[in-house]
Amino acid sequence: MTQEMPFDVTRARRAGARLAAVQALYEMEQTEKSARATIREFMEDRLGLGPDGTPVEDADPDLFKSIVNSVVEHQAKIDTAILARLAEGWKLTRLDATMRALLRAGAAEFIAHQELSDAIILSEYVSLAHDFFDEGDAKFANAVLQNMGRDLRA
């Protein structure tokens, strides 16, 4: 007999997976490590650790892997969608590397996790944006993700 996890435990595990995915994507960009190597490293040593290295709620490993792999699989489409929301003449490299990772992860969930509502994905990534950035940058992430979500799911 399987026992269902309470909603808030499941929600916390999914939030942990999203945080880990943003961290992994950031690391992949900075070190040029492959998705496979980065996922393996996180699964063995770092999944479930916060930005400062302290333990947080166990992260959902399946969601973590899905987000990272979806970014890799759909990166051209995702980056095109992000670029379409930037000011004319801006390049992706003008964005902070953590912001790029966060926007890519959110976009990947819009593509790969049709079972989740736009509102849930948006709320989770805006919450993460508040963890990393000031209010202005969190509002920027909100606007970009909200517009991308509509287009990526259309």
Swiss-Prot record:
The keyword RNA-binding applies. InterPro entries: NusB-like_sf, NusB_fam, NusB_RsmB_TIM44. Keywords: RNA-binding, Transcription, Transcription antitermination, Transcription regulation. GO terms for biological process: DNA-templated transcription termination; transcription antitermination. One of its GO terms (molecular function) is RNA binding. Belongs to the NusB family. Involved in transcription antitermination. Required for transcription of ribosomal RNA (rRNA) genes. Binds specifically to the boxA antiterminator sequence of the ribosomal RNA (rrn) operons. HAMAP family: NusB. This is Transcription antitermination protein NusB. It comes from Hyphomonas neptunium (strain ATCC 15444). The gene is nusB.
